[in-house]
Regions:
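Intrinsically disordered, low-complexity terminal tails of fungal membrane proteins
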Residues: 1-140, 318-360, 433-455, 577-587
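A six-helix transmembrane bundle that forms the core substrate pathway of small-molecule transporters
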Residues: 118-587
Length: 587
């Protein structure tokens, strides 16, 4: 065990901007000064002279061994986000304003945890503690990231691959295209509903158990889809399948944060975040070739095989990474090995029940949507964009099959424009990071604290993307003539993909930093709005394109996006004042 540095500081010794980061560590059992015992990792035969050398005044002969451990380094942070994610569900409650310092991954954020003087509070034995997920090899951590990203990709691909089956489902079940589209809408609605329950459950039982259970049911509910005797069975199974698969869209971001320190987090989080947006574009591409050569059932057989492989990988290679649950396991082992029942982990001192946590995780997102104009407008903006993306699954076949004579597999290939655009948008991340760095530097030059930031500094990509999107939609709409080469609307769809990624990258980080105490709820509100808009838009998309024409239907969508474009600029300029008058946002 590596002893803590003598220069380790308490929360009283650091600037206010550092205190949030320290409170994060306390919430997941990471000591910021020599106050906690190093669990029982010291060798039993360690000499008393060594103990006295650590702190002679506190370790006389016969007393407990010294408590001298310091785990993850304190990182200056403007916002509190333990582990680097905003996916925890332990938001503060009314009447407990002082209990919560951030939305961190720690169990105990927003709940009572043992005070710093507690003698038997279990914490990590330094950075190299073998139980600490951040001590795993880089290869293993990246393999876990890739498995989580592939699982998320599988779920979102399942949402859109289904759209390739419409042509065969309608005559077989004697139903309309609108009813078939309900299968897409209900699945996406399930993706927005599931996190309300699965996210808080992961705070109590760990991420691994939620992954295994949810993905098992995701695989199980795929079977009724593949053998559905009627459309009602298909629709019910699709909704439940979406609920089950939503865990990797809501919980897996926390897994990435568990394994990587903040200075390492950017690239793995980018890889994971990209997968839910890339998946929908792959679905029609794969599904088009499947149904062109065989029946619609094989779309689900392929997904069952893929999901089965992912489930095996999850069971074999994805361990528990949630720090509070791991510390609880460590405390249980210590009590068993030492016979001392005083050893305790922070999560074991929670004063909130599972049902109460789930209830708050369902209520808080709607409070933010109803009472926070910044959260509401940014959620509407991102929801409209995802709704348009899913509407394209109905619009693309109309445009490219009717105007250009594409087959169903060729129509799937048309989605490569969106795919390339999104990948391009992801690759521009270093540009926005440099802009963010310049804004931070300007703030320092104007008298701000070194390293300090403002949530609004995350919005430049959203500002640009919010204007790129309507331009791309107008361009796409007015090039959907048979006389215009098919590559032109595909190019504009790629530009739409770039703008969509730029909008989301800024919105997500802004919400987490602007609402540090309620980051999980802010993200849940965004996810809920996005999912239900994405579920609703396809239901009227085809009718709108048929009644208004391809050009004017897309123009309506462009004006809808254009109406939301000024809001990121307003929030960039006046966000600090709005946050100052907010009951939920950071000042």
């Amino acid at each position: 065990m590596a002893p803590s540095s003598s220069s380790s500081r308490s929360s009283l010794d650091v600037p206010e901007s550092d205190s949030l980061a320290i409170d994060e560590e306390k919430s997941i059992g990471l000591s910021t000064k020599s106050a906690y015992p190093p669990s029982s990792s010291r060798k039993e035969n360690e000499t008393e002279e060594e103990e006295e050398a650590i702190d002679p005044s506190k370790t006389p002969r016969g007393r407990r061994r010294s408590q001298d451990t310091h785990s993850l380094k304190i990182v200056r942070s403007h916002h509190s986000r333990a582990g680097g994610d905003g996916y925890t569900c332990f938001d503060a409650e009314p009447g407990k304003p002082g209990k919560q310092t951030g939305a961190g991954t720690g169990a105990g954020a927003g709940a009572d945890v043992p005070e710093e003087g507690s003698a038997y509070l279990v914490s990590w034995d330094g950075d190299a503690d073998p139980l600490n997920p951040r001590s795993m090899s880089m290869l293993r951590r990246w393999s876990i990231v890739l498995i989580c990203a592939a699982s998320s990709l599988c779920v979102t691909c399942t949402s859109s691959l289904y759209t390739s089956t419409y042509g065969q489902l309608m005559p077989e079940f004697g139903t309309s295209r609108l009813v078939c589209t309900l299968g897409l809408s209900l699945f996406v609605a399930g993706l927005g509903t599931g996190p309300m329950v699965l996210s808080p459950l992961s705070e109590f039982y760990g991420r691994r158990l939620i992954y295994i259970c949810s993905f098992t049911f995701f695989l199980i509910w795929m079977i009724p889809c593949a053998v559905a005797p009627n459309m009602a069975t298909m629709l019910i199974a699709r909704f439940l399948d979406g609920v089950a698969g939503s865990a990797f869209l809501s919980v897996a971001g926390g897994t990435v944060g568990d394994m990587f320190a903040k200075h390492e987090l950017s690239l793995p989080m980018m890889v994971y975040t990209a997968s839910p947006f890339v998946g929908p574009e792959i679905g029609p591409l794969v599904g088009g070739f499947i149904v062109e050569g065989t029946t619609w059932k094989w779309c689900f057989y392929v997904l069952i095989i893929w999901s089965g492989v992912q489930l095996v990988l999850i069971v074999l290679f994805v361990p528990e990474t949630y720090h509070p649950v791991l510390l609880r396991q460590k405390a249980i082992r210590l009590r068993k090995e030492t016979g001392n029942q005083e050893w305790i982990a922070p999560i074991e001192k929670l004063d909130r029940s599972v049902s109460k946590t789930v209830l708050w995780s369902c209520i808080r997102p709607f409070q933010l949507l109803f009472f926070e104009p910044m959260c509401l407008n940014l959620c509407i903006l991102s929801a409209i964009l995802l709704g348009i993306l899913y509407l394209f699954f109905g619009a693309f076949p109309l445009v490219f099959q009717n105007n250009h004579g594409f087959s169903i597999s060729q129509t799937g290939l048309a989605f490569l424009g969106l795919f390339v655009g999104m990948i391009t948008g992801i690759c521009t991340d270093p540009i926005w990071r440099r802009i963010y760095g310049r804004l931070v530097q300007q703030r320092e030059e104007q008298g701000g604290e070194p390293g300090g930031s403002e949530p609004e500094f995350r919005l430049p990509s959203t500002i640009v993307g919010a204007w790129v999107v309507p331009i791309a939609l107008f361009g796409f709409g007015w090039t959907t003539y048979p006389s215009v080469h098919w590559i032109v609307p595909i190019i504009f769809s790629a530009i739409f993909g770039v703008g969509l990624i730029w909008v989301y990258s800024g919105v997500f980080t802004f919400l987490v930093e602007a609402y540090p105490v309620y980051a999980a709820s802010a993200l849940a509100a965004n996810s809920f709005a996005r999912s239900y808009f994405a579920g609703a838009f396809p239901l009227f998309g085809v009718q709108m394109y048929n009644n208004l024409g391809y050009q004017w239907a897309t123009t309506v969508l462009g004006f809808l996006a254009l109406a939301m474009a000024p809001f990121p600029i307003l929030f960039f300029r006046h966000g600090k004042r709005l946050r100052g008058s907010s009951r939920y946002a950071s000042a």
